[in-house]
């Protein structure tokens, strides 16, 4: 697509940025609402979500694929690591079952972003 990001990727980045910014704010502002065992660690997790949401938001605004692809790769890695570690914690019983929906959403974003990244890659780059 002439070195430009697709509409599908841009929409995905926008939804990703909005969702994880809200989720991150909830962790930072009200870790008790997230049933945190350790509020300080929950706030750090929230800050990480806010940082990744900011990166996705900035990538959404950028149209050149060459300037967006590294951000997309980082988001994919983050979502894979998030989904795997959360699922591990849930299955081991250390995290409340209420965390399944965001864990599944993280896995969905990882798959969706990976599929869009593969589709966006320009042959020969």
Across the structure, where does each feature detected by a protein language model lie?
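Short membrane-interface helical motifs at transmembrane helix boundaries
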Residues: 22-35
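Transmembrane-helix signature of multi-pass solute transporters
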Residues: 22, 81-84, 108-111
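Non-cytosolic membrane-interface motifs at loop->transmembrane helix junctions
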Residues: 35-41, 70-71, 94-105
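Cytosolic juxtamembrane helix and N-cap/initiation of the first transmembrane helix
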Residues: 1-19
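Short juxtamembrane and helix-loop transition motifs at transmembrane-helix boundaries
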Residues: 4-9, 33-38, 60-69
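Core segments of alpha-helical transmembrane spans in multipass integral membrane proteins
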Residues: 18-23, 39-61, 73-81
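Membrane-water interface at the C-terminal end of transmembrane alpha helices
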Residues: 108-125
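Membrane-helix boundary connector in multi-pass membrane proteins
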Residues: 62-67, 84-101, 117-119
């Amino acid at each position: 697509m002439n070195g430009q990001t697709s509409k599908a990727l841009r929409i995905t980045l926008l939804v990703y940025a909005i969702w994880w910014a809200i989720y991150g704010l909830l962790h930072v502002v009200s870790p008790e609402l997230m049933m945190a065992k350790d509020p300080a660690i929950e706030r750090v997790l929230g800050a990480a979500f806010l940082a990744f949401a900011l990166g996705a938001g900035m990538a959404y605004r950028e149209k050149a694929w060459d300037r967006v692809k590294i951000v997309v790769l980082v988001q994919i890695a983050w979502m894979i690591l998030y989904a795997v570690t959360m699922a591990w914690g849930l299955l081991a019983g250390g995290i409340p079952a209420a965390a399944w929906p965001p864990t599944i959403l993280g896995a969905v974003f990882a798959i969706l972003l990976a599929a869009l990244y593969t589709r966006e890659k320009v042959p020969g780059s």
